[in-house]
């Protein structure tokens, strides 16, 4: 099956849509031609599928990698920048990314920190679950799903709060953490167009405390809402014509999870892993990642808001206040 689902040209913003909205499909890629060649916002995933996705998409628009001069990365995750290795085989563009994701773009091992893998391993060890994730390798996990990560040669910090001119588009850089510490969205005010990255789409992106957590995610949605965008193009999925409604839906889904946890605690005290299993009643790997990070993000907010508390002890249970 082709990794490309379709294409769209929005007044010079050329979109390459991935075959599906769910990971490990690559992110949508945005291409903006100009008199010097072209710029890209995100480049897609590593692995052979990611390579085909990128090259086939550019071929559709009659473009070649050698003419790429600028890459803006919404964040340093493998489905958004894994294909940078294929780019660097042909050309060495200027690469812009938020300062908080620069380290991960240059040395992907830092993703184990922002994905909160150590947190997940700690909670898993305390819980005594039979599945052993003590040797979990995040990058093998990426490779196994065909969504490999790769490193940039050099990057520049993108000017948060300022504008970046890409062809005929003037994008305001909006810092929108939650899913990644340096996640950005790009807003063209004249067109009312918001490139929302992973934060708005069919469902919420995963989130961990180190990436901004639930608190950061909700604040990012507030920031997006204040822009009063008309149209959103997410990193995963198709064009969204009612931007405000899409943002409200994601916020509602996030808060529904919080309410679900609160109601679970009304039935009695529960451990961290019991709450994680309530949120994600699927396979153990989802309990481990991203389940632990998501659960921790909710509990941090709920403790801050004074609606739950944790009992004493290493494996203390959570209770409602």
Set out the residue ranges of the language-model regions.
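Conserved beta-strand hairpin/beta-sheet module of binuclear metal-dependent hydrolase folds
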Residues: 4-61, 67, 93, 110, ...
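Short Gly/Pro-enriched turn/cap motifs at secondary-structure boundaries
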Residues: 5, 20-21, 146-148, 153-155, ...
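Active-site HxH/HxHxD metal-binding segment of metal-dependent hydrolases
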Residues: 25, 45-52, 57-164
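Metallo-beta-lactamase
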Residues: 38, 45-48, 136-149, 165, ...
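Short, leucine-enriched amphipathic alpha-helices that occur as contiguous helical runs
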Residues: 42, 93, 254, 258-262, ...
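Aromatic/hydrophobic pocket-lining residues that form the small-molecule binding cavity
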Residues: 54, 217, 221, 295
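Histidine-centered divalent metal-coordination motifs
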Residues: 74-80, 98, 179, 183, ...
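C-terminal regulatory/interaction regions
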Residues: 260-321
């Amino acid at each position: 099956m082709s990794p490309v689902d379709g294409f769209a040209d929005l007044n010079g913003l050329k979109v390459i849509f991935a075959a599906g909205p769910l990971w490990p499909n690559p992110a949508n890629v945005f291409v903006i031609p100009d008199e010097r060649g072209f710029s890209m916002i995100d480049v897609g995933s590593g692995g052979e599928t990611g390579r085909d996705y990128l090259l086939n998409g550019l071929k559709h628009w009659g473009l070649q990698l050698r003419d790429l001069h600028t890459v803006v990365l919404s964040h340093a995750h493998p489905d958004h920048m894994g294909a940078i290795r294929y780019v660097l085989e042909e050309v060495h563009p200027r690469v812009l990314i938020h300062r908080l994701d620069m380290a991960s773009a240059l040395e992907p091992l830092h993703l184990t920190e922002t994905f909160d893998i150590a947190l997940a391993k700690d909670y898993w060890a305390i819980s005594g679950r039979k599945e052993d994730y003590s040797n979990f390798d995040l990058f093998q996990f990426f490779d196994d799903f065909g969504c490999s990560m790769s490193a940039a040669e050099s990057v520049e910090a993108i000017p948060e709060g300022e504008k970046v001119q890409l062809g005929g588009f003037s994008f305001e850089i909006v810092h929108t953490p939650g899913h990644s510490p340096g996640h950005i969205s790009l807003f063209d005010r004249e067109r009312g167009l918001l490139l929302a990255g992973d934060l708005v789409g069919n469902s919420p992106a995963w989130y961990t405390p180190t990436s901004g957590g639930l608190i950061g995610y909700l604040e990012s949605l507030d920031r997006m809402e204040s822009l009063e965008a008309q149209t959103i193009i997410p990193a995963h999925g198709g064009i969204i014509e009612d931007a405000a409604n899409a943002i409200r839906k994601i916020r509602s889904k996030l808060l529904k999870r919080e309410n679900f946890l609160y109601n679970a605690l009304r039935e009695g005290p529960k451990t961290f892993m019991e709450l994680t299993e309530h949120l994600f009643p699927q396979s153990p790997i989802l309990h481990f990642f991203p389940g632990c990070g998501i659960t921790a993000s909710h509990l941090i907010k709920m403790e801050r808001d004074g609606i739950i508390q944790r009992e004493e002890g290493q494996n203390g249970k959570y209770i409602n206040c």
